[in-house]
Amino acid sequence: LASSAASDVYKRQILYRPTRGMVSDHFNTDKKHFGTDIAANPNESVLATMDGTVFLSTYTAETGYVIGVQHSQDFVSIYKHCGSLLKKEGDRVKGGEAIALVGNSGTLSTGPHLHFELWYKGHPVNPEKYIVF
């Protein structure tokens, strides 16, 4: 349901691929994997997928350096396991703007990659339905 509504809204948006690399793990709610993993070179730029405001820029033991961006139309994007963060909470960002660098941070990381999540109205949606990786 959320995915269908998200699709309708997203058709009117310009989305940027969050980093260069290859998909190494897919969105799978059954496995509680609420994002797409993109294997990438360390220090590759992580880009905001759309315009928005950074609401989270922090470090956690499990997910390492994490940045979250609130977008219009009730969308949120989350970027985990970064090597470093380039923006702080409250910063306005443009779609395609570098917000972090790819890394291997956090105990759940298995190598240099970006774990990218997309949420619509509080529900995870499959990023691969909206962005060509």
Regions found by a protein language model. Give the residues of each.
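Single conserved hydrophobic/aromatic residue that forms the stacking wall/gate
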Residues: 1-6, 10
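Conserved strand-loop elements at the edges of beta-sheets that form or border functional pockets
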Residues: 3, 17, 40, 48, ...
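Soluble periplasmic/extracytoplasmic beta-strand elements of cell-envelope proteins
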Residues: 16, 22-24, 35-37, 66-68, ...
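Short, well-structured beta-strand-loop connectors
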Residues: 45-54, 87-102
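Zn2+-dependent peptidoglycan hydrolase active-site motif and core
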Residues: 49-86, 112-113
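Conserved, short, structured surface segments that act as functional micro-motifs
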Residues: 91-133
